[in-house]
Amino acid sequence: MGLSDGEWQLVLNVWGKVEADIPSHGQEVLIRLFKGHPETLEKFDKFKHLKSEDEMKASEDLKKHGATVLTALGGILKKKGHHEAEIKPLAQSHATKHKIPVKYLEFISECIIQVLQSKHPGDFGADAQGAMNKALELFRKDMASNYKELGFQG
């Protein structure tokens, strides 16, 4: 399941593009998540009232939360798999407070891949996509493992 040094480099290279504009990337990821999987919107009291894509695009709170999500994920990716200290509190809050199922982490991972494909086609070829998929799968596996330890069946 681990990634090679070369794969981590591909992941971090494209992530550098994300970090150049985290708010717009995060906003687009969340909009894709909510439009593609409307049931996920129910987990966000702050955004439940946003029904249209235009309302979502106009929401500063949604943009801020998208930036928060991708900033946290970037911190995890930069650990190149040695992310236990970052995953534990994230899993704790997502299992006990927010009750976010692992399936929703799969959904948002798909959205992240789609946004990267859309915004950075030249920097996100097949090798980079494969590496990012592996990195996100590792993240989800470790979140699920922590969920299990916490007794959350999400």
UniProtKB/Swiss-Prot annotation:
<keyword id="KW-0561">Oxygen transport</keyword>
<dbReference type="Pfam" id="PF00042">
    <property type="entry name" value="Globin"/>
</dbReference>
<keyword id="KW-0560">Oxidoreductase</keyword>
<dbReference type="GO" id="GO:0098809">
    <property type="term" value="F:nitrite reductase activity"/>
</dbReference>
<dbReference type="InterPro" id="IPR002335">
    <property type="entry name" value="Myoglobin"/>
</dbReference>
<feature type="modified residue" description="Phosphoserine">
    <location>
        <position position="4"/>
    </location>
</feature>
<dbReference type="GO" id="GO:0016528">
    <property type="term" value="C:sarcoplasm"/>
</dbReference>
<keyword id="KW-0813">Transport</keyword>
<dbReference type="GO" id="GO:0004601">
    <property type="term" value="F:peroxidase activity"/>
</dbReference>
<dbReference type="InterPro" id="IPR009050">
    <property type="entry name" value="Globin-like_sf"/>
</dbReference>
<feature type="binding site">
    <location>
        <position position="65"/>
    </location>
    <ligand>
        <name>nitrite</name>
    </ligand>
</feature>
<dbReference type="GO" id="GO:0020037">
    <property type="term" value="F:heme binding"/>
</dbReference>
<feature type="modified residue" description="Phosphothreonine">
    <location>
        <position position="68"/>
    </location>
</feature>
<feature type="binding site">
    <location>
        <position position="65"/>
    </location>
    <ligand>
        <name>O2</name>
    </ligand>
</feature>
<protein>
    <recommendedName>
        <fullName>Myoglobin</fullName>
        <ecNumber>1.7.-.-</ecNumber>
        <ecNumber>1.11.1.-</ecNumber>
    </recommendedName>
</protein>
<keyword id="KW-0597">Phosphoprotein</keyword>
<dbReference type="InterPro" id="IPR000971">
    <property type="entry name" value="Globin"/>
</dbReference>
<feature type="binding site" description="proximal binding residue">
    <location>
        <position position="94"/>
    </location>
    <ligand>
        <name>heme b</name>
    </ligand>
</feature>
<keyword id="KW-0963">Cytoplasm</keyword>
<dbReference type="GO" id="GO:0019430">
    <property type="term" value="P:removal of superoxide radicals"/>
</dbReference>
<dbReference type="GO" id="GO:0005344">
    <property type="term" value="F:oxygen carrier activity"/>
</dbReference>
<keyword id="KW-0408">Iron</keyword>
<dbReference type="GO" id="GO:0019825">
    <property type="term" value="F:oxygen binding"/>
</dbReference>
<keyword id="KW-0479">Metal-binding</keyword>
<comment type="similarity">
    <text>Belongs to the globin family.</text>
</comment>
<dbReference type="GO" id="GO:0070062">
    <property type="term" value="C:extracellular exosome"/>
</dbReference>
<dbReference type="GO" id="GO:0046872">
    <property type="term" value="F:metal ion binding"/>
</dbReference>
<keyword id="KW-0349">Heme</keyword>
<keyword id="KW-0514">Muscle protein</keyword>
<comment type="function">
    <text>Monomeric heme protein which primary function is to store oxygen and facilitate its diffusion within muscle tissues. Reversibly binds oxygen through a pentacoordinated heme iron and enables its timely and efficient release as needed during periods of heightened demand. Depending on the oxidative conditions of tissues and cells, and in addition to its ability to bind oxygen, it also has a nitrite reductase activity whereby it regulates the production of bioactive nitric oxide.</text>
</comment>
<comment type="subunit">
    <text>Monomeric.</text>
</comment>
<feature type="domain" description="Globin">
    <location>
        <begin position="2"/>
        <end position="148"/>
    </location>
</feature>
